């Protein structure tokens, strides 16, 4: 089975889980495949020349879409929802997937896990980050990332973080604009190494439309944008 057909079948299965009607499914699958079919060599490989993603294309879908870029790997991919749930006192947890099964998990827009990238984030302590993004939190908080490496097993990275509120701005994503608050999460480890995560949070309903988040030394920063919301 060639890569294009495999991608098409996996995409169709994902869309089938989110929408009904065979005619609608085939139409959406065809539209979305025009975007993802050039990503057949795997997620976040060097970026191919992608078709232009327009609002008209996105409006033709009933499934949400998440764009993820990894500048360190010169990679770009489009993901669709796999699992969503809302945990009491913890907030919504959303796992997104590509057609090849590589996954990214966000809680309230905050990165908590990756799968299939290599050197994946396997577990985290992001409670302080989530509180900050959702409007609460203290003056500082810990951030922990557990990274599954191919050579050293699980490597833990611990940071101490503070938050900075940068004010309200207008964010544009594929022909639509959103009123957002710009947030920075500034973290240092025991050696003095510094990372900075960025979040753009809708001032109306708290949707985290766009982020830039650290995912470990091998992956570097991951940039996410919600192209189409649930």
Whereabouts are the PLM-identified features?
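C-terminal partner/receptor-binding element of secreted or periplasmic proteins
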Residues: 128, 134-139
